[in-house]
Amino acid sequence: MTFLAILFVIAVLLLLAQLPVIGFYIRAVYFGMCLIIGGFLGGLASIPFGKSPNNHFRMFKIFQAMTWPMGVRFELRNSEILHDKKPYIIIANHQSALDVLGMSFAWPVDCVVMLKSSLKYLPGFNLCAYLCDSVYINRFSKEKALKTVDTTLHEIVTKKRKVWIYPEGTRNAEPELLPFKKGAFILAKQAKIPIVPCVFSSHKFFYSHAEKRLTSGNCIIDILPEVDSSKFDSIDDLSAHCRKIMQAHREKLDAEAANLNI
């Protein structure tokens, strides 16, 4: 009887999911649950290994498997650039929570992510983030943010870590990238390491919070050649250059993605 009841609930949810707005909320809640449960299970699986950036891969495998039914597919290009063993800063455009899924396909070894401090309170996810040695930054306190930069710099130098940063600092669904925050570029200049730009094509073809739309779709992830931070006289020049090449490439990828999502 219980089994039949479960089947009935699943059938009802599948039918409701066909209605655009209701389907959006069902898929959004499902994605959120995948993030929490995937993080928790990935965290549990990582406990025997202690804190390590490479624990990310356990969570990512679980998360990718759980979200597969959603039908959002990612095509990774130029992944060989990520295989470099030396430390670098990887910067990516940030559009939505779906970026967590996208980054799982482009994640290099020995890499930590810089997260906004509020995420440390997200159940399940916070366990995995702790065991993955993630870095939390307080965007509303300059003093605390600078302290985080100093700590991260020490990790890069002593442990040869790579760091994943979203330089826009917040989600941005618009075609034009937001002005970049300086943290990633300060780190690159002070640590004397390159920056590797990572560009995601627009999610607009399958996701829109404003339109309450979340469907299956395709996203392109392209890894651009590394940028030598030592060749720029100032942090502002380095930031402006990275933003310029990422903006141009984003527009190119969006044109391709439009054809993939017809």
From Swiss-Prot:
Where is this gene product found?
Membrane
Identify the residue span(s) of motif HXXXXD motif.
Answer: 94-99
| The keyword Lipid metabolism is assigned to this record | yes
One Pfam family this chain carries? Acyltransferase
Q: What is its main location?
A: membrane
Its Enzyme Commission number? 2.3.1.51
Provide the topology term for how it sits in the membrane: Multi-pass membrane protein
Q: Name one GO molecular function term.
A: 1-acylglycerol-3-phosphate O-acyltransferase activity
Transmembrane regions: 3-23, 29-49, 89-109
Q: Which GO terms describe its cellular component?
A: endoplasmic reticulum; membrane
- Gene Ontology biological-process annotations: CDP-diacylglycerol biosynthetic process; phosphatidic acid biosynthetic process
Known SMART domains for this protein?
PlsC (SM00563)
Q: Which reaction does it catalyse?
A: a 1-acyl-sn-glycero-3-phosphate + an acyl-CoA = a 1,2-diacyl-sn-glycero-3-phosphate + CoA
Copy the pathway line from the protein's UniProt record.
Answer: Phospholipid metabolism; CDP-diacylglycerol biosynthesis; CDP-diacylglycerol from sn-glycerol 3-phosphate: step 2/3
Q: Which UniProt keywords apply?
A: Acyltransferase, Lipid biosynthesis, Lipid metabolism, Membrane, Phospholipid biosynthesis, Phospholipid metabolism, Transferase, Transmembrane, Transmembrane helix
Q: What is known of its domains?
A: The HXXXXD motif is essential for acyltransferase activity and may constitute the binding site for the phosphate moiety of the glycerol-3-phosphate.
Q: Its function?
A: Converts lysophosphatidic acid (LPA) into phosphatidic acid by incorporating an acyl moiety at the sn-2 position of the glycerol backbone.
Q: What family does this belong to? A: Belongs to the 1-acyl-sn-glycerol-3-phosphate acyltransferase family.
| Protein name, as recorded | Putative 1-acyl-sn-glycerol-3-phosphate acyltransferase acl-1
Give the gene symbol. acl-1
